Swiss-Prot record:
UniProt-listed Gene3D superfamilies: P-loop containing nucleotide triphosphate hydrolases
EC number, UniProt record: 2.7.4.25
Gene behind this protein: cmk
Signal peptide per UniProt: none
Binding site for ATP: G11, P12, S13, G14, V15, G16, K17, S18, T19
HAMAP family linked to this entry: Cytidyl_kinase_type1 (MF_00238)
Alphabetically ordered keywords of this record: ATP-binding, Cytoplasm, Kinase, Nucleotide-binding, Transferase
UniProt-listed InterPro entries: Cytidylate_kin, Cytidylate_kinase_dom, P-loop_NTPase
Organism: Mycoplasmopsis synoviae (strain 53)
Listed name of the protein: Cytidylate kinase
Catalytically driven reaction(s): CMP + ATP = CDP + ADP; dCMP + ATP = dCDP + ADP
GO molecular function, one term: CMP kinase activity
Main location: cytoplasm
GO cellular component: cytoplasm
């Protein structure tokens, strides 16, 4: 039996972190934790409860009443309701960076994941600060990259499959805006750490990326 390790996958919005992580988790029988979905759940929670998303104090206070759970098949439940597909809506995509830039929100998510993984192996965690904040001691660190144009097209295709109609130019604008926010935020800005392996997946198929990462693990 091969010894399991912990894998952290970082990278910008829409690069395919979750898709790749899910496939790797399935192939290696690992547990996948999508940090982005937790941030999206917080955004959903704030909107659902008519909280002003720009009022940091109220957003932070709302964390005390947040009830959610992750299933083994990577579905997310909010107070018993499966909101996995709802979390991919455009409204949630636009609102998530507003809440995720709040330091207390980031600490909440980081603490949640670290408690789940403490003293354990066989986890694959993705996010935009996973390699240096959430899982700084991960055995394998990957930084996925792709051009904004490629990521925008992938997002449009993904939304179409989920039943959402998206305009390419609008999605591209939002992705570039998100990149700027992530790379320039005051706390834990997105960046590649020295010990992370860079994989430019702009012209790679998903299975090629998956196999590349698995080869690095083994």
């Amino acid at each position: 039996m091969e010894l399991k390790v912990n894998i952290a996958i970082d990278g910008p919005s829409g690069v395919g972190k979750s898709t790749v992580s899910k496939l790797i988790a399935k192939k290696l029988n690992y547990t996948f934790i999508n940090s982005g979905s937790i941030y999206r759940t917080i955004a959903y929670h704030v909107i659902k409860n008519d909280i002003d998303i720009n009022n940091e104090k109220d957003v932070i206070s709302s964390l005390d009443s947040l009830e959610f759970s992750l299933s083994k098949n990577e579905e997310l439940f909010y107070k018993g309701e499966n909101i996995t597909l709802i979390l991919r809506s455009e409204q949630i995509s636009i609102s998530t960076p507003v809440v995720s830039k709040i330091p207390e929100v980031r600490e909440f998510v980081t603490s949640y994941i670290q408690k789940m993984t403490k003293g354990k192996k066989g986890f694959i965690i993705d996010g935009r600060d996973t390699t240096f904040k959430v899982m700084p001691h991960a055995d394998v660190k990957i930084f996925l990259w792709a051009t904004a144009e490629e990521r925008a097209q992938r997002r449009v295709d993904q939304n179409h499959q989920l039943g959402y109609n998206s305009n390419y130019d609008e999605v591209l604008y939002e992705i570039k805006k998100r990149d700027h926010q992530d790379m320039n935020r005051e706390h834990d800005p997105l960046h590649k750490t020295e010990d992370s392996i860079l994989i430019d997946c702009t012209n790679m198929k998903i299975d090629e990326v998956v196999n590349k990462i698995i080869s690095l693990i083994k």
